[in-house]
Amino acid sequence: MSRRKRTGGAAPPPAGDARAAERPALRLVPTTAGEDRAEDHPSRWARPNLRSVVIASGKGGVGKSHLAANLALALGARGARVLLVDGDLAQANLDLLLGVHPRFDLQHVLRGEKSIEEVLVPGGRNVTLVPAASGVPELADLDDYRREVLLRALGQLEADYDLMLIDTASGVSRQATSFCLAADDVVVMTTPEMPAFSDAYGLIKLLQPQGLARAPHLMVSMAASEEEAEETAHRIRLVARRFLRLEIDSWGWIPYDPALPRALRRQEPVLTAFPQSPSAAAYRALAERLWETPGGEPERTMPTTPERLQA
C-alpha cells in the first residue's frame, strides 16, 4: 500500500483537560460534529476522548492477535495510553503473545467476583491488558445481558486511556458482532488466500446492514509482496463497492514473516523479540501513521473513509 503523508489540523482538547493538550492525538477518521452514536446503538460507547478500534476477521489464523498486540505496543511507544482488550472471551491468547500471566480475567468480572479494574494487567510500553479466559465454554456465547454488562464495564475505563484496541474472536459470533457495533472503527483482517478473502467479505457483508459507526477498514497480512497485498485489498474493495455499495479504505499490509511464529514460541511480541524483522517494521510504520507526534513532523492520518453510497 502507498504510504502518503497528509496534513491537517488536530481537534483541540476539551477545555480543562491538560493531559489531552500534552499528548498526541489518534488520527483516525474524524467523528462528525454533533453525531451521537450512543443514541443510535444502545451498546455503543459514548465518550469524548477515547477512540475504540476493533480488529476482526472472518476466519482464524490471519494474524489478528499479532496485529492487536504489536500495534498496541508500537502505539504505546509513541506515547499513546492503550487499553488492549482480549475480546476472544473463551480462547484468549493475548496474554501469551505479551508474555504476561494474569491472575484474574474477564470471567471473574462477568461472574461478579472482580471489578474490571481488578483484572487489569500491565502489558508494557503504556499498554494495559484486559485479559480473557481460555477453555471456558460458558464465555463462548454470552447472553444479551452479560454482553451488555461487559461493554459497560469496559466503558468505565475510558477516562484513563487514549485508545481501546479490541482483539475479537474470529468469525461472526454475537460477541464479535457486539464489539464491532460498539466501536468507532472496525478493521477487518484477511490474507491473500481465497478462504480468508471470502470470509473477510462475508464478515463485512454481515456487519454492513447492522449499523457500524462507519465503513470498516481493511488490513492484509501474510502477503508475499506489496503488490500481492494491494491486489487482495483491491479485490475486496471492488466486490464491496459492487454488491454492498460500500467504500472501504485500507490500513495497509503486514508481510509474511517467519519471525512471528518464532516470537510466539518465545511468548514475546515480535516488536521486542525481533525488532528488526519485516513485520515489526510494518507494525511501527502503521503506528506512526495512526499516531501523530506534536511538533516537527507533518501529521500522519489514516485516509478518510468515504461515506456510504446512497441507495
Map each language-model feature to its residues.
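Hydrophobic positions on the alpha1 helix immediately C-terminal to the Walker A/P-loop
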Residues: 67
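P-loop/Walker-type NTP enzyme "switch/lid" segment
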Residues: 57, 84-159, 234, 258-269
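Inter-motif core of Ras-like GTPase G domains
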Residues: 156-159, 173-194
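G-domain G4 guanine-recognition motif of GTPases
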Residues: 58, 191-192, 216-230, 253-260
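Post-Walker A helix-loop "phosphate-sensing" segment adjacent to the P-loop in P-loop NTPases
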Residues: 74-83
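NTP-binding/hydrolysis catalytic cores, primarily Walker-type P-loop NTPases
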Residues: 265-311
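Extreme N-terminal, non-catalytic leader segments
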Residues: 1-62, 80
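Beta-strand-loop-alpha "switch" segments that mediate conformational coupling across diverse proteins
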Residues: 242-271, 283
